[in-house]
Amino acid sequence: MEIKIEKTLTPKAKPDESSLGFGQYFTDHMFIMDYTREKGWHDARIVPFSNLSLHPACTVFHYGAEIFEGMKAYRTAEGNIQLFRPEQNFARLNSSAERMRLPLVDEAFALEALETLIKIDADWVPHAPGTSLYIRPFLFGADPKLGVHSIDRSVFIIILSPVGSYYKEGINPVKIMIETEDVRAVKGGTGYTKCGGNYGASNRAGEKAEQAGYSQVLWLDGVERKYIEEVGAMNVMFKINGEIVTPALTGSILPGITRKSILQILRDEGANVSERLLSIDELIEALEAGTLEEGWGCGTAAVVSPIGQLYYNGKTYTINNGKIGDTTQKLYDTLTGIQWGKIEDTRGWVHPIK
């Protein structure tokens, strides 16, 4: 399929790279592609970044037919631009689409479209250390009618945003509140997808945590409220008495690409790694016994984020004296080193934009 290109006549001024924040600025262009049941995907185009015009009865507004992805483009010290495992993101996008009964995209074409878009907006990829170009592909149902029904029309869009650190703490330890009332997802639901509803449903607990001075919520399972699942924007890992434990993917947890990459790095280095059920009781016992050595979250937006404090049932627990642990620091350095081209990629994870 040909990608039609319309370049902006009024380029925007670039933001100050020292204060990018997250998701506040957007590049000059975006990719759009339409779908109808009769024609399939068509009218692939790159156009100036602008607002969308949608029918008030559009499916996405009423029935949550929406999925998205998140990835980044990095600028190396040599000035080159590269992606990190983008094929994994588009495969996960299609996994989410299948669950939500949205049309699948051609993964190779989606990557081609992304590469073309990045080349056009290449000067938006920031140069400052720790910055990157965040990539947000999203897909939604666009039928102009009410009623729960099979989706006949959809739209696929990619937008780009230069970003700094996801958390204001940066690589410094974050404080996490363990949620005991609300749940994020259950087995058989949409927990393993990146659909907007998962995040919308987390807002109440997230707001409660924020008001109490915590960066994120750590979710327990939706049935027994017993097993650790994930943080709102990250998968989680804990080092307990030398064993690195991360919750197993049971269908209610997002299969993170950063998680997958870290597990491979750890196993390649011979670390003692387990993907298993981890109860809140086991975690608290390890904290009280002093055997919980480190904890960290991991995801595309935050990369690796050390957990310095947990709040549970009215009590505050400090991990590793509130400092970043050696394993956490090494993982952060290794992963970001590969992403920014400082460390040789020996696993075929880097995808250069040529």
Predicted regions located by residue number:
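Helix-start/capping segments and mature chain N-termini
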Residues: 1-117, 138, 145-354
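Extended, Lys/Arg-enriched charged tracts that mediate electrostatic binding to polyanionic substrates
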Residues: 126-136, 140
